[in-house]
Regions:
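Gly/Gly-Pro- and Ser/Thr-rich, intrinsically disordered tail segments characteristic of DNA damage-repair
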Residues: 1-112, 188-201, 222, 231, ...
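Short secondary-structure junctions and interdomain/linker hinges
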Residues: 17, 21, 143-147, 160, ...
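A sequence-level detector of short, solvent-exposed, charge-rich linear segments
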Residues: 26, 33, 168, 172, ...
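Hydrophobic alpha-helical segments with strong N-terminal bias
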Residues: 36, 145-147, 236
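Short hydrophobic "helix-edge" motifs at membrane interfaces and signal-peptide entry regions
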Residues: 41-43, 152-154, 242
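Generic detector of intrinsically disordered, low-complexity, polar/charged segments
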Residues: 48, 69-72, 128, 158-160, ...
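Phosphate/anion-contacting hairpin/loop surfaces
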Residues: 63-176, 180, 185-200, 251, ...
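C-terminal accessory segment of soluble enzyme catalytic cores
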Residues: 200-263
Length: 263
């Protein structure tokens, strides 16, 4: 599933590919359960992300519509010549220059609706670092933080954008905090500020590296990869590493961690 880095890169791709295009029509693959909606005869498109959330902004003479989209397990966008959309394209925007922006979703888990950001998700740890930190600290008394650190890092209400591989790298690179401690204790420890800093730093590094080379993810065309951080395989030290331990956590996801924390 795309995490913060991949969703932000998706927004970059869309913005880079459609910046000067004018669109006139929207189409939907009838095999998808999502609703087809009407658009003005002439509109522009831009994209923005917040954690794992993604929006297309449809700007026209009457204002701007906010199309909130979930990427599902493997959703992404692709620009092609109109009529040459790739297989599993489910929502298509046709431009006047003869190209089409398509939402491609092999597993059809992605959804769309006209809405603002989800009120049940917290601030973006990268784009709104202070807001993220303040939000976590102001909610530490909530029962959610009684759970182990490794599970709470997956709670999108507080850690919007942190997913399976990012939590593994955050905890591993923090180094000396037991991931099975209650999250509240870990955050209030003398390493708590470092933990929250890594929740911003690690997703941003993954973004600079072009996103996770995991499963169906491919870095979008035209995205600059910052090689100063090394290669993705060098950077990814914990997740998927056969020398690490792994368990199924309380939410059914596989958690990779340093063997020193094995109980």
């Amino acid at each position: 599933m795309p995490e913060l880095a991949e969703v932000r890169l998706t927004a970059d791709y869309v913005n880079g590919m459609v910046e000067k295009k004018t669109f006139f029509e929207v189409r939907k693959n009838p095999s998808h359960k999502g609703k087809l909606f009407e658009c003005p005869d002439s509109f522009r498109i831009s994209a923005v992300s917040r954690g794992k959330e993604f929006k297309l902004l449809l700007e026209h003479s009457g204002g701007t519509e906010h199309l909130l989209m979930t990427m599902g397990m493997s959703g992404y966008f692709k620009v092609t010549p109109t009529g040459e959309e790739i297989k599993h394209s489910h929502l298509m925007f046709d431009a006047e220059d003869g190209t089409t922006l398509s939402f491609v979703d092999v597993r059809r888990f992605g959804k769309w609706s006209f809405n603002d950001w989800n009120k049940d998700r917290g601030p973006d740890p990268v784009n709104d670092k202070k807001g993220f930190t303040d939000y976590v600290m102001s909610n530490l008394s909530k029962p959610a933080f009684n759970k182990p650190l490794h599970e709470v890092l997956m709670n999108q209400k507080y850690f919007n954008g942190i997913g399976n591989y990012l939590r593994a790298e955050i905890i591993y690179k923090l180094g000396d905090v037991d991931p099975f401690l209650p999250a509240r204790d870990a955050i209030l420890s003398d390493r708590g500020s470092d933990l929250l800093e890594l929740c911003s730093q690690i997703p941003y590094e993954a973004y600079l590296l072009g996103g996770g080379n995991l499963y169906t993810w491919e870095t979008p065309q035209g995205i600059e990869i910052h090689t100063s951080l090394g290669s993705w395989t060098d950077w990814m030290q914990c997740y998927g590493n056969p020398s690490m331990e792994k368990i199924l956590d309380g939410i059914g996801r596989r958690f990779w961690f340093d063997p020193k924390w094995k109980k």
